[in-house]
Curated annotation (Swiss-Prot):
This is Glycerol kinase. The gene is glpK. Gene3D superfamilies: 3.30.420.40. Belongs to the FGGY kinase family. It comes from Rhodopirellula baltica (strain DSM 10527 / NCIMB 13988 / SH1). PANTHER family: GLYCEROL KINASE, SUGAR KINASE.
Length: 539
């Protein structure tokens, strides 16, 4: 048992003189401004894994302004990843104030706040004081992997998957929450007495934005806890018993687009309606306007997350994709298939930091474009195992097909193509399980700006790849659900009209060549699988 001690979190961030001079985080609402921007807007709070961001959206969907502030990552032990929840709150409030200050916005012109957040990150705090009893355990944290192994070995996988659409994994909240209750002195007893509150990061922001009046979450975040039944739309008593979680700690669950309450007036000078929330990937699906069954989006970040709208039935995936909740507006329920790829943009960072063949990430496209193809080189970026649809924790990255003629340009191109091949594998699984052809893939994230990658992606999946003008789709989704709740936008058709295309990449590669390359990729992929076990047996 560990006793964790935290200083009492600030309700407002401490601001030093340097911050005031550099970032202007403090807003004086009593002064008479020289100029004030007179436009109605939605404020999206985008709380991510490495930074807190605030983005202002106008009614036409354009971005008025952005503010961002990074926060500290904590790695107390190998495989453990934590965040200071107080720092998350203070940075999020700071950037919200900053973006209003930058653009001289009148708070009364902010129609609503929408929240999107890193999913699965788990936090418990004291209801009376608002103090976290432990650092937030981040979605990347693997400390409960052995607990998950034990649950799978005990035969609980089918029950959990049928109820939640998820596989038993340390990625999700349930075992993280149980770990906190079992390892913080007195936590379990206090939880059972109703003294503690559990939440994902959206819940933590709601709590602080309302001065502790609101303990709530939305359906998309609830669906990632491994405690919420996606069919009944309720916390599941059998799952709560399995993971030893007392019901007293749980937040209320609401549709993504919903008036949750309003902010404390002291935070921004006036109260602002809290119009919605959604986990980051579901928010991006909505931000990409994928509101009809069969529509899919892929986010290219450190990894890739592909979601496909599958409509009103929470169909199980024979290919072991996740079945998750899409944004709900209080009317019909919608679901999505999700496929996670662990390493995507991170492979470019490895080319830079690990191999040193590029000086900056932006160089990879021009280097890769300097050769016509990879000259038979394939790179399987299984540095952290393989995600969907392979789910092989023992796979490792491999680089095959090397000759004396191989250059760094061939390796750079193979790295980009390795991202696209992984996406194609997930898309194939979605096509197979849904029976939908999927003729268009909407894309966002940093690597979506890489034209070479996007063209190869279109070629290898045999479908259009569509890049939107506004690539801040995660924040846009949060803005949309909040704006729909308050009537800022009338309906989803209103939002569809403002969604605009930047560029469409049409498949150009002959089908025979696509088939040949995918056969070679599949051969390379097989060689990467179960590598750790093979290495162990060889020793």
């Amino acid at each position: 048992m560990h006793t964790w001690r935290f200083r009492r979190p600030f309700r407002e961030p401490a601001i030093n003189r340097t911050d005031r001079m550099r970032d202007h985080f403090s807003i004086d609402h009593k002064r008479t401004p020289r100029r004030r921007l007179s436009v109605k807007a939605i404020l999206a709070l985008d709380q991510g894994t490495t930074s807190s961001r605030a983005i202002l959206f106008a009614h036409d969907g354009s971005i008025i302004g952005v503010s961002q502030k990074e926060f500290t990552q904590h790695y107390p032990k190998p495989g453990w990843v934590e965040h200071d929840a107080t720092e998350i709150w203070t940075t999020q409030l700071a950037v919200a104030r900053d973006v209003l200050k930058q653009h001289d916005m009148d708070v009364s012109d902010i129609e609503a706040i929408g929240i999107t957040n890193q999913r699965e990150t788990t936090l418990v705090w004291d209801r009376a004081t608002g103090e976290p009893i432990h650092n937030a355990i981040v979605w990347q944290d693997r400390r409960t992997a052995s607990d998950c192994d034990a649950l799978r070995n005990a035969g609980h996988s089918d029950c959990v998957q049928k109820k939640t659409g998820l596989i038993i994994d340390a990625y999700f909240c349930a075992t993280k929450l149980r770990w906190i209750l079992d390892n913080v002195a007195g936590a379990r007893e206090r939880a059972e007495n109703g003294e503690l509150a559990f939440g994902t990061i959206d819940s933590w922001l709601f709590w602080n934005l309302t001065g502790g009046k609101l303990h709530a979450t939305d359906v998309t975040n609830a669906s990632r806890t491994m405690l919420w039944n996606i069919h009944t739309g309720q916390w599941d008593d059998e799952l709560l018993a399995l993971f030893k979680v007392p019901k007293e700690v749980l937040p209320s669950v609401h549709p993504s687009s919903h008036i949750y309450g309003e902010t404390e007036s002291s935070l921004f000078g006036k109260s602002i309606p809290l119009g919605g929330a959604a986990g980051d990937q579901q928010s991006a699906l909505f931000g990409q306007n994928c509101t009809q069954p069969g529509m899919a989006k892929n986010t290219y970040g450190t990894g890739c997350f592909m979601l496909m709208n599958i409509g009103e039935e929470a169909a199980a995936s024979p290919s072991r994709l996740l079945t998750t909740v899409a944004c709900w507006d209080g009317g019909k329920r919608e679901y999505a298939y999700e496929g996670s790829i662990f390493i995507a943009g991170a492979i470019v960072q490895w080319l830079r930091d690990g191999l040193g063949i590029i000086q900056s990430s932006s160089e990879v496209e021009s280097l890769a474009a300097s050769v016509d193809d990879t000259d038979g080189v394939y790179l399987v970026p299984a540095f952290a195992g393989l995600g969907a649809p392979h789910w092989d924790a023992y796979a490792r990255g491999i680089l095959v097909g090397l000759t004396r003629g191989t250059t760094k340009a061939h390796i750079a191109r193979a790295a980009l193509e390795g991202i696209a091949f992984q996406v194609a594998d997930v898309l194939d699984a979605m096509r197979k399980d849904s029976g939908v052809a999927i003729e268009e893939l909407r894309v966002d994230g940093g690597a979506a700006a890489n034209d070479l990658l996007m063209q190869f992606q279109a070629d290898i999946i045999g479908a259009r790849v569509v890049r939107p003008k506004v690539i801040e789709t995660t924040a846009a989704g949060a803005a949309y659900v909040a704006g729909l709740a308050t009537g800022f936008w009338k309906d989803s058709a209103d939002i569809e009209r403002i969604w605009e295309t930047d560029r469409v990449f049409e498949p150009q590669m002959p089908a025979e060549e696509v088939a040949r390359r995918r056969r070679r990729w599949a051969a390379a992929l097989e060689r990467s699988k179960q590598w750790v076990e093979q290495e162990a047996s060889a020793d």
